[in-house]
Amino acid sequence: MKIEDKLVTSVISGLKALYGQDVPAAQVQLQKTKKEFEGHLTLVVFPFLKMSKKGPEQTAQEIGEYLKANEPAVAAFNVIKGFLNLTVASATWIELLNEIHADAQYGIVSADENAPLVMIEYSSPNTNKPLHLGHVRNNLLGNALANIVMANGNKVVKTNIVNDRGIHICKSMLAWQKYGKGETPESSGKKGDHLVGDYYVAFDKHYKAEVAELMEKGMSKEEAEAASPLMNEAREMLVKWEAGDPEVRALWQMMNNWVYTGFDETYRKMGVGFDKIYYESNTYLEGKEKVMEGLEKGFFFKKEDGSVWADLTAEGLDHKLLLRGDGTSVYMTQDIGTAKLRFADYPIDKMIYVVGNEQNYHFQVLSILLDKLGFEWGKSLVHFSYGMVELPEGKMKSREGTVVDADDLMAEMIATAKETSQELGKLDGLTQEEADDIARIVGLGALKYFILKVDARKNMTFNPKESIDFNGNTGPFIQYTYARIRSVLRKAAEAGIVIPEVLPANIELSEKEEGLIQMVADFAAVVRQAGEDYSPSGIANYVYDLVKEYNQFYHDFSILREENEDVKLFRIALSANIAKVVRLGMGLLGIEVPDRM
């Protein structure tokens, strides 16, 4: 039983005994005692002054005396201006640690058969280039969010919508056709997504050269762009694709498959995956159908040029284009089509879209449209909106080939982690295979943690050098502390020490030890809160605070060399449960922790 619940029950009994009044539990406010005061939990007594008919200090004193006499969990109390600070007894903290120790998945709630089904969409790549740093933030947030939502007792379906059609895809295809000379991933030794990305860059280079040439001949920039033979060929290719031209479709299929093989490798290395992948080429026609259905029902209207619009002025928005005059779709149409397919595939209770904050308006509109079209979860659609990520050098552009690829970034992080770990002697005594694995775990952990510790809504700068630091609020610092605890536990096991189910309760704990148990116990509430707020950063920063406190404890107290056997057992058990919570917390973020370092 939570200590807070135990104390609330006793406070209710005390108010009845002292003042003859029944008080609902919701009226009893307990909060953590401020650091500058003595105690663990503080009771706010102001709501009880009417029934006590006394001043705040006297009321607090009377309730404190009652609790000290009748509730074994209260060892002492003090009163500061109507706030009753309660010190929890050591035996109660030890009892709480026993409960946490008995639960291997402490803080994690499993879904039962009646649990709500939450679908989370993330990644959403284009098939004309590799995944880049922006996708890294998206994938890491989406994956962590899925884990956190699942840890709160929900069923989760992780889904991806691949943007596999459109003019941008045709640009890569046309460039390969013109300049590729039959090059393949096998013949070039390149990953398929990188090879296709090279041709996207090549298209842009040739297109810019054409435009410059036409401008030299006296055309304006707009005229030159409209007259570019290369761009017109790309547009023709798109028309052929839409018409199902067998040659264009075969080329599209071949190049997309190269990209998917490359994506799979990147996702695997990053440690993210999906339960279901949707492709825009399958969903955009469904969207058109649904829009036409909405038009028939009078939800939408048609303009003279044949384009279909939604009038959202009643919702405080404007008119939104859903189908162009020539019948071609826009992004909104595709999202409606994807929603239709998903709703047919799964009984979705909630839909979360992990998409950058530049799309805030888009999802505001989508929510209204889905609701109009009869999707039950339309109104409660969640846009998990996150900020942009940059490197210290500045922004990224993929058309010009100056983008930071996810593969290159991960490889660089792993190489830097290896170098740094070797310099600090963290890999001493390990085999080559073990050292490589540690470098992978530390490098990717540094990347993931640095991105996930930041509030998702904020823009951020990812600093690779800063992220691989074994001190401070970083992944490697947390991983090293975990490995340090595992080393303590191994030595304890080698000495034949076994943690009992029930620890001796006859020891006096230090303030630091009580504080650590309180922090470990908080993990369950932190997971709940992260689920309510959709906040991976809440978990990340909690884990950092916990290991920072543990490191101080490790420095100031003997563990294995402690002479009192009961105290030694307690400290080993405390260390084991801190390691467990660190592993579970980092696991929710998709970060591995090494057993040794």
From Swiss-Prot:
Example GO biological process: arginyl-tRNA aminoacylation
Q: Where in the cell is it found?
A: Cytoplasm
What PROSITE patterns does UniProt report for this protein, alphabetically? AA_TRNA_LIGASE_I
Q: Which PANTHER family match?
A: ARGININE--TRNA LIGASE, CYTOPLASMIC, ARGINYL-TRNA SYNTHETASE
Quick one: a GO cellular component term? cytoplasm
Q: Tell me how this protein assembles.
A: Monomer.
Arranged from A to Z, the UniProt key words for this protein are: Aminoacyl-tRNA synthetase, ATP-binding, Cytoplasm, Ligase, Nucleotide-binding, Protein biosynthesis
Under the GO molecular function aspect, what terms does this record hold?
A: arginine-tRNA ligase activity; ATP binding
Q: Which Gene3D superfamilies match?
A: Arginyl tRNA synthetase N-terminal domain, HUPs, Isoleucyl-tRNA Synthetase, Domain 1
Which ranges belong to the motif 'HIGH' region? 125-135
State the reactions this protein catalyses.
tRNA(Arg) + L-arginine + ATP = L-arginyl-tRNA(Arg) + AMP + diphosphate
Gene designation per UniProt: argS
- Hey, which family's this protein in? Belongs to the class-I aminoacyl-tRNA synthetase family.
InterPro entries, alphabetically? aa-tRNA-synth_I_CS, Arg-tRNA-ligase, Arg-tRNA-synth_N, Arg-tRNA-synth_N_sf, ArgRS_core, DALR_anticod-bd, Rossmann-like_a/b/a_fold, tRNAsynth_Ia_anticodon-bd
What EC number(s) is this enzyme filed under? Answer: 6.1.1.19
- Keyword Coiled coil carried by entry: no
Know the name of this protein? Arginine--tRNA ligase
